Amino acid sequence: MERTFAMIKPDGVRRGLTPEILARIHNKGYRVVGLKQMMMPRETAEQHYGEHRERPFFGELVDFITGGPVVAIALEGENAIAGWRAMMGATNPANAAPGTIRADFATSTGENVTHGSDSPESAERELALFFGDGELLS
């Protein structure tokens, strides 16, 4: 079984999309092994999006992600990384396939409702960043 990190961003939480997104996760057969709603500390956001540090949008991205609660989710299942990314759809909702979370709910590339790890390495790093020892179900 593979694990991945998923997140409902502040725009999704603010718009009350958490129950719908969790239902979609359940309906796809993924197991939620960790879940927490939280205000993301700025330091955590800067670590999480560290690869974008030199990009012009970095400050705005950190401000957005720390500007409201997020839902951090640890998912487990067969091909969880690729499967969750397929469920999310393309980063730009205009390019997202019909029926994906972003096609259905995102309003822009910046406010695209969800995040998902893009590799086993980033999944491991992101899960460790958001969940401490003993916080994930075995």
From Swiss-Prot:
Its cofactor is Mg(2+). The active site is at 115 (pros-phosphohistidine intermediate). Major role in the synthesis of nucleoside triphosphates other than ATP. The ATP gamma phosphate is transferred to the NDP beta phosphate via a ping-pong mechanism, using a phosphorylated active-site intermediate. GO terms for biological process: CTP biosynthetic process; GTP biosynthetic process; UTP biosynthetic process. ATP binds at residues 9, 57, 85, 91, 102, 112. It comes from Deinococcus radiodurans (strain ATCC 13939 / DSM 20539 / JCM 16871 / CCUG 27074 / LMG 4051 / NBRC 15346 / NCIMB 9279 / VKM B-1422 / R1). GO terms for cellular component: cytoplasm. Belongs to the NDK family. This is Nucleoside diphosphate kinase. The gene is ndk. It catalyses: a 2'-deoxyribonucleoside 5'-diphosphate + ATP = a 2'-deoxyribonucleoside 5'-triphosphate + ADP; a ribonucleoside 5'-diphosphate + ATP = a ribonucleoside 5'-triphosphate + ADP. PROSITE patterns: NDPK, NDPK_LIKE. Homotetramer. Its EC number is 2.7.4.6. One of its GO terms (molecular function) is ATP binding. Its main location: cytoplasm. Pfam families: NDK. HAMAP family: NDP_kinase. Keywords: ATP-binding, Cytoplasm, Kinase, Magnesium, Metal-binding, Nucleotide metabolism, Nucleotide-binding, Phosphoprotein, Transferase. It is found in: Cytoplasm.
